Amino acid sequence: MTKEIKRELTAIMFTDIVGFTALSAKNEREALSLLDQQREILFPIIHKYNGSIRKEIGDGLLITFRTASESVQCGIEIQSTLKSNQELKLRIAIHEGEVAVRGNDVLGDDVNIAARLEPYSAVGGIVISGRVQQNISSLPEYKTEYMGHPELKGVAQSIDIYCITSNNLPMGKKIDSLSQENKISPRPRLNIFSLTGAILTFAGLIFWIYVGFFDVSYGSANEVPSVAILMMENLGNTQD
């Protein structure tokens, strides 16, 4: 039987273990041990703030919360707890939006946005979207810093990014509003196709002028020139 799909407004958290891919390629046993350690440390904190662990994606966690403030407070406690841990280092991203919920699965554009925000987090830090920032801006215990307005792959929405600086959490790098390739405005370059088009247009104009003014048909030598005589009406009082 197909489970009912519901829509919910929720805070969405993504976590990711720093360096896990490289570790799993070198030492699978240590990588698996790190996953066990993550569950042991994070799960009790997540449940403390009424978070729902929706999915484990390799070393990443997808978690939802009822409110933005609960998700931020949970993230702060997680990162504060891990400060002394030399093995387990996380990046955390939080966004808020409407998602489709079926059983324990959550889907939607806002889930994708939360995932796209995560790489902008500093190691041991937390990044949040502008929506989360708006919801916690009146709460003095949360300090944030604006990072920028990136273009997120596969995301049509306009997203501002902030980082949490409460509890001495590290701040991520400022984000240029332009993409990496366009950070420095390039000098104007003459496109070869534009140049070719301009030359052809100019040549066509010259040809048209030449044909219009100099290609006069004189006819054959036996032809007698004809003169057109037009009747004119005398509008004056005197005869000419």
PLM regions: where:
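Short loop/turn elements that form and flank the Walker-type P-loop nucleotide-binding site
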Residues: 6-8, 87-89, 223
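A conserved hydrophobic position in a structured secondary element of the catalytic/binding core
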Residues: 15, 128, 230
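Intrinsically disordered, glycine/charged-rich C-terminal tails and inter-domain linkers
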Residues: 124, 131-212
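An acidic helix/loop motif centered on a single conserved Asp/Glu
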Residues: 201-202, 212-240
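Short, solvent-exposed loop/turn segments at secondary-structure boundaries
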Residues: 24-27, 104-107, 239-240
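Catalytic beta-strand-to-alpha-helix segment of the class III nucleotidyl cyclase homology domain
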Residues: 3, 40-43, 47, 62-158, ...
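A short, flexible beta-alpha/helix-coil linker loop
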Residues: 19-20, 97-100, 232-238
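Catalytic NTP-binding/metal-coordinating core of nucleotidyl cyclase/transferase enzymes
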Residues: 1-77, 81
